[in-house]
């Protein structure tokens, strides 16, 4: 399907609360109603074409295109660096835009078998009619967050805005985003923050000017200009500066909007995320009496329980890859009617039955309802091989189980979007958001987001409950526990006062600074020893209050023993092990446990002092980032450090 790229956004309705309904028009006749959630997927997962390679992604793409006819995806264009090693492979992809590659996947029979990987695949005997898809091509700036040395020069492209636009154009982007530099969740002085923001701001202006120069039938995508801030004030200031510069540019190109970045590293702090988004949308509404207020607004990486609140603030589009990550962890999000808590409650695949899938009734559950028992057996088998599984008439590969769970989880997200649209149409979204926050099981986090969005204070019970009856034997890792597949980097962190640990500012900062999906965080509790991130919300972990001190020698020995036991039991699951600890008591535990196990890297390597204030020092966080960039390349460094400590 050859087509012109000419994408526009039209605001159809805006409620008193600020929530909006709109339409994105793309291609020849394509339409997408907003608010909309773009599934973030990887497309270039090896040699062409669209339905070939990529483990679970190939099944997701095949089902969502050939069966669902889903018409909007986001992909971060630099993801090819994770799957390809040569310029030649990339050049093969760039011969055609993504729309053409997708059209070829829709054909039936044995045409282009090599390109589409159809040999031996059960569902390619039928042809499906091609249709238009809206491809949102993100610049890939998030890769720069954890690796400032990232480069695509070996593929023939300098890492600069001009190259990014060239790639987005060749790939056929209907929506494109400017090359940006996300802000890690660290403490910035004003000068450093503005310098980082200005790099993104200048790239946004460059992109707008570059597309404004296009003429005739040259592609005219909808442009999202990236905006960044670390709180309300800095987000508001950045947005206002960007708008003033756009005014001075005097460009005539009108198909642009604003994409809010740097939210993913802060997403566990829902109130902060809402404040940052409000800073952006307030600045847009205030500038020149709302001159740009009909432009679309995107929130990068936001989905799930935050969507209702952010829609109320005026966000039109979202994207998410969390449905894939939840699926890879073999988790199934329960439909809202199956729980009185929130849409975030999950079950493991082992807990599912045909009745569970039948009650859900989503497209994924309908497709795989008869295969749930074989899939439960399949996840225990070897990866990357086809298996004959009892109960299935055809061979199965483990990636299909991941794909099924991922697509079901995405369907739950889509249902929430549709519910939000209905509430906007009825002018009842504000009440819905408050009810949603109050019934959520997120321990007040969504209440804080609602308060940040509206300025209203919501009464709620005092503080976090602490149990005085918990002992060090109140929590243990179950014998059935296994570290999640695909996470082959172990990162040990010290515990925090705030629970769950992932909600603590210190943990948020480190998780944001090392967003590699392969990192498995295990927290060293001063009371319990190792606590894997999947078990952080166990009641015994949420409600204890104990800080390990160097003087508690017997407890220090017990915690050390438990951490050592964890390493000996599960250490072979990881290709790289590191402990990032600055406090003296927890550093003693980490050092002794790593030494007893025989490998692992203790960071920071030489802190100025052994106190918690060193935890977020820029130099120390940067050392951690560098250590995790290439775990295998760090092997000699690990061995050297251990040898020195013996």
Question: What is each PLM-predicted segment?
Answer:
Residues 487-490, 494-574, 578-581:
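A polyanion-binding, active-site-adjacent surface
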Residues 556-646:
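Glycine/proline-rich loop-helix segments at beta-alpha junctions forming the active-site rim
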Residues 2-216, 445-483, 496, 501-515, ...:
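Non-catalytic, usually N-terminal nucleic-acid engagement modules in DNA/RNA processing proteins
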Residues 34, 219-221, 484-490:
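A short, charged/proline- and glycine-enriched loop
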Residues 321-442, 563:
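Gly/Ser/Thr/Ala-enriched C-terminal appendages of enzymes
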Residues 37-40, 73-79, 136-140, 178-179, ...:
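A cross-family glycoside hydrolase active-site/sugar-binding cleft signature
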Residues 122-133, 163, 167-176, 203-223, ...:
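A structural motif corresponding to the C-terminal end of an alpha-helix
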Residues 2-3, 30, 214-374:
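Glycine-rich phosphate/ribose-binding loops and adjacent secondary-structure elements
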